[in-house]
């Protein structure tokens, strides 16, 4: 999908907006936040563009829908900065209902909704954080969550990306090391 996402949008935008009318609210919806330079719809497309063949369909679906409820959850602070409190939970609930209406299997619905729900957690650069989230959602889902965040950050303001990328890269390295350590323990047994 990555490099062809804007061709896809030109050819199929009207279709996806009819299939999922909630996306209509995202088109042109300004985020009014220094961390964002695109409206919600364009941000989503740029996040999809940042994916490659290593991203599975679960992760790509989560990226497509991760900010679908931002317009509904939009609030401005006293300085006029836009915030989207609760959009990840509202989005997960919406997508759960949508996917159930579409009769998609739980093997798609549950992991996609889980990724959407947790994509706004505060990421901490520590082994404890990695262990906690692997225990909570599993190794594969945690890696998908990190991949979603990498794509999400790629679609944000370049001025703020560097530090976010450093944390995500460190978490990926930590997860890989922890996985190798666990694999060695399993092999020894």
For each feature predicted by the language model, list its residue ranges.
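Terminal helices and disordered tails flanking the catalytic cores of nucleotide-processing hydrolases
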Residues: 127, 157-189
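Acidic/His-rich, divalent-metal-binding segments that scaffold phosphate/diphosphate chemistry
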Residues: 1-77, 83
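Detector for Asparagine
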Residues: 4, 11, 32-33, 96-97, ...
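Exposed alpha-helical structural elements
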Residues: 7-11, 15-18, 22, 107, ...
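Divalent metal-dependent catalytic cores for phosphoryl transfer on phosphate-bearing substrates
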Residues: 50-159
């Amino acid at each position: 999908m990555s490099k062809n996402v804007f061709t896809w949008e030109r050819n199929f935008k009207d279709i996806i907006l009819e299939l999922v009318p909630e996306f209509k609210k995202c088109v042109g919806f300004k985020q009014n936040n220094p961390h964002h330079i695109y409206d919600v719809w364009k941000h989503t497309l740029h996040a999809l563009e940042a994916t490659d063949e290593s991203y599975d369909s679960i992760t790509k679906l989560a990226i497509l829908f991760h900010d679908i409820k931002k317009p509904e959850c939009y609030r401005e602070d006293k300085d006029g900065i836009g915030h989207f409190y609760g959009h990840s939970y509202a989005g997960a609930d919406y997508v759960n209902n949508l996917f159930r209406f579409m009769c998609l299997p739980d093997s798609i619905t549950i992991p996609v909704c889980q990724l959407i729900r947790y994509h706004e957690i505060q990421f901490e650069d520590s082994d404890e954080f990695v262990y906690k989230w692997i225990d909570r959602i599993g190794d594969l889902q945690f890696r998908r969550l990190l991949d979603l965040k990498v794509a999400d950050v790629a679609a944000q303001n370049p001025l703020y990306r560097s530090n976010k990328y450093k944390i995500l890269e460190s978490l990926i390295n930590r997860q890989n090391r922890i996985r190798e350590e666990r694999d060695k323990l399993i092999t020894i047994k």
